[in-house]
Amino acid sequence: MGFISNAILGKVTGLGTKQIERLREQGRAEPARHRRKLHEYEHTQGSRSHSSKDGSRKDRMSSEDKTRHKKLKHRSRQPGDKPTLPQPETDMVFGGLDKCPLYGVVMPMGHGKTTLAQEEGWIDCDSLITPSTKRRLAADALRKLADGDEYENAMAEMSSMMAKALQVLTPSKPAILLSHSVNLLKICQIPCLAILSLEDGVFEKNLRLRDEAEQCAARISKRHLEAAEGPGRPVITVQDNEHMRTVIYQIAESMDVELGAPRLLHPECSLPPGVGGTEWCDLTELVGMYESGRLPRAVLDYQINAQGLKAYRGYGFTMNDWAATAAHLVDNTCAADGAIPSLDNWPLTLEGIGKTFDMSEDIDGQALLAAHGGEDEAFTLGLLLHWKMYGLKSDTTGRLRLLYYVRRNRWDLVMRKVRQGVLGSGTFMGEPITLAERDILLSLHMLSSTSVSALVAKWRDEKMGYPSSRPSKRLMCHFDDILPHLVVQVPGSDPSYERAAWDVFLSGNLKPLRECAAGLLGECKLKRKHVISYLLGVRLLNEWEDEQGAHRVAREAMKQVATNWFRVGKIRDEWFDLIGAVLDGECRADDPIAQMAVMMTKTSSCQNLSGMPWGVRVAEAVQRIVMVGWCGLQMDQKVVLQQTENGVLPIVLGNREEDYIIELMKLGAPKYMTSVTGSEESVLATMAELADWSRSGVGLVLELVNAGSWLGQMSPKDRIALLANWATRRETTGVDSVLFGEILDRFSRQWLKRKFTPRAAEHLRNLGRISRRDGGLGIAERVYRGTVVPGKDGKSWNGKDAPRIKKEFVERVPKINLVACRNVLTSPKMGFKWNAHSLGMCGALVSCFLMGGDKHDIEGMCATVEGIKKHRVHPLASLPDWEQSYPEGAELDEAIEVGINDCMMMLEQARV
């Protein structure tokens, strides 16, 4: 039996590294048994074909004999006769500790390793193991210690598990590993710089809040390390916890490791005043200092973690956080054995892949299947296809392959942590990633959605998370051109409330509030956030007249705007930075953006303050104004505020909703900010999300594997429409043509009873261009009259005769119909409403969301998705190839510029 057959029958128990190497060296034996049976069969059949005694020739083989003959020929085919799946050009990378030095400092349990690691970003050995596994192994270690076993022997299994996770990390600069065992450093070949131990009194105080078992283990750990002191490995006794940090700082500085609070060692360091200590600083200012090159990254990460934030504007996610993610990644404790349940009556299965492709020497494919033995075939097949179709092409360095080996029972947890790390740091395990790799890392979590309920639930919770499209240079350069198109009328206010707002500025001791007052008085540059903070305070005090606590709430709102508090509640992207630049930009006192933002900010009673923070409300209002103002500039129309069912929103005067949305899609606005038309709040954002789904790699793989279980019983016309949709996407997804062609061939043979040849693809394309009243699908942009030969059901194409197109055509332009989309998405009816038209136009994944509405609503929603997809450029497609592959292009340009300047200085010195 082949490898796939063994996997399906449950005979694969796992492939280790040695087995993989043996497969690579030995290959596979030739199927001589099948060739022998074939030769015997052909010999007997050949004797039958001789002429009889009377000279007459016997009839040819019966149909049953022909079938047997064909099967034996197929089984005797040499492996080289089959196509092979794409193979990686690089081996899988399990870690990169050899690229950048990692230094070890040994500290017993209860010495503050966790606190130091969380603040400094250093790697805590406890982060290298999951909490559940740690509890289990710690209990085993305590039993061994109670039986009199040595400390290192008792901790050996835990150290081995930690070392396994450590090998996944790829630190980009020198770092410190805080370990409670010398043996862990030996296993990983990490140099031990020092062994530190607290005085007994301080040590016992640290243990007061721990349970009895942890206290016992910590005392044994301390006693063991102190007893292990010897030549070349002294134990340094430290007075208290503060002194412990100072000693580690001295050790780290000697090895060129960045410090989070360098002023503890050097109070007169060269950092800006007030920065580099343990005191909390304004994070916005620190980000600006770091991005301008005036601050080390470690200082910024220290402040973010010390203030209790997991991530802030793409910073704060450290190597210690990646260590915790790596622990979940390698903690694949479920045994890889048992049968892989087979998909029923679906053209694409693991067994079918094994028959179509030669996997005898497919090392990475075999390892993936072995890792998922006993799991659902839809999930396993989806992983295999996604790896071969997309992951392999993007994984240029061999770093992503390990993710595909994560078992189903841990998949969602691991992928959630990976997404958090990628969004919070812009790296993977500490190493920079390309946009193509980022796209895969943020969307892999969807592969576990093998049922419709799981698909819808995950979509609501996490979405696909595609990289945001950056604002165009045109928008950045011509931002001021938006201002003349903004028209706003500010209502009057009571002078007493204006004085009260001034009192907030003048009486506060917060630096940003004092800056607002100075800007409004003309003593420094007047920023847009100064004006918004003042006007918002006046409005809140005016609307909350006589309400108890109004002054306190208004002061908090003004402070959040002045301090850019919105950065805390949002994930960083390019649009996020643009809004920060708009708020910090210089403006006049009557700035229309500031006035509009204040009037758009939703306010309620100060006794009912549920909802988004004030800073986030203002930031989103500014972002809406910028996007709608840009659309007004492109359409040469004025932008005004209008009261809608969703509050006060900006609109473009004298425009069609369709034209406005097209401009919005061209702008590349983030999906979460596209609900600015005054229609249903989430409809346009949902349509933009579904448009990205319908052209994504993960969406295509999910459809190829799960469309049958999602949609249930499909008519012949539904199947033809779905196949036509996949054939169209084959030309736009960039997948390997041979691989995708073989996959489509399996569907074509079962559904159309013909091979998927270029001629068959042309027939499907023409079928989509013929109107539905003539028997076609009517899903192309230009729909023609034509002739289609029906099949046995009398409704669908017979799959053989070529559809013929006539010259007469009806032009079909995708329309934007949010009313139809709202009817479909919000209809109380249950059950799918998809049809062949929706399957052919949008595919199976989008069709799963067609839960209600009539036929015209469904067609309107599909047309809306196609219309948005036509104008909304994919973030990866909008970038040049070099920028997709090398995100550090700006750093490279800067390095080249510095090198040129250095050369010019040398030439000038030589000339002098």
Swiss-Prot record:
<feature type="region of interest" description="Disordered">
    <location>
        <begin position="20"/>
        <end position="91"/>
    </location>
</feature>
<feature type="compositionally biased region" description="Basic and acidic residues">
    <location>
        <begin position="20"/>
        <end position="32"/>
    </location>
</feature>
<feature type="compositionally biased region" description="Basic and acidic residues">
    <location>
        <begin position="39"/>
        <end position="67"/>
    </location>
</feature>
<feature type="compositionally biased region" description="Basic residues">
    <location>
        <begin position="68"/>
        <end position="77"/>
    </location>
</feature>
<protein>
    <recommendedName>
        <fullName>Uncharacterized protein p3</fullName>
    </recommendedName>
</protein>
